[in-house]
Amino acid sequence: EISSDIPKVTIIGFDRMLVENYKCILEYQDFFIRIKMKSGIVNINGFELVMKEMTKDDLIITGNIESVDYEKNVM
């Protein structure tokens, strides 16, 4: 099992996504969500995107997810 503080992204089909151990939401629109993680940034593109459930550690995103990309922190 993964350590509890390591960021984790789980995509379920084309319409649901679980983001664990995120730091903050940088940008939120119904077609684009940008999330700061410990080791980089996750960008989600699609349409009708909704942050369905949110806790201080976990986030569930629903909608039509078209693409997800990751920008790794460069040190």
What are the functions of these language-model segments?
Residues 1-75:
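N-terminal intrinsically disordered, cationic/polar leader segments
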